[in-house]
């Protein structure tokens, strides 16, 4: 998809702050510093739309981006950062649970994982959470450029088996450096939005 317009609309922490819109929404989740911001910037053809932080756990709000006046991307705060206090972690949990369980505009989620490593307990928990609430999920296995091409399938198998990926959920090999998987990611996103609104 050709992105001609991408703007941040609002940073929200509670439902009354969410955009008053019927446009489909795609939530983007992932561990702190997994490369989620780089993924968003790459797929939207923007270098600095989403700030890439060297400090894990920096995003503490749901950031809504309006794409081509057609849909919203919702950047969810990164999880799994050990130095976040229990109070902050609990607040984060409540915020995302409220969004995922009440937002009718939500069509699907994108879960960004690092292809180089086995998904963590937090990755598994996040995927299970999405499945518990029956949210269609696209898994973006990023940093593919850091692994020899001949080992991609082996690493994909580990991701698939560790998360126990359900039938219907797609896994897309991705690289923010080379742009690998960009078209496939957009195809998967369109499929999810069309499927739900068909």
Swiss-Prot record:
The residues that hold Mg(2+) are 37, 59
Q: What is this protein called?
A: Probable GTP-binding protein EngB
Q: List the disulfide bonds.
A: none
Organism ancestry:
Bacteria, Bacillati, Bacillota, Bacilli, Bacillales
Tell me the organism: Bacillus mycoides (strain KBAB4)
Q: Does the keyword Transcription apply?
A: no
Cellular component, GO, one term: cytosol
Q: Where is the EngB-type G domain?
A: 22-195
Q: Name one GO molecular function term.
A: metal ion binding
GO annotation terms (biological process): division septum assembly
Q: Which cofactor does it need?
A: Mg(2+)
| Functional summary from the UniProt entry | Necessary for normal cell division and for the maintenance of normal septation.
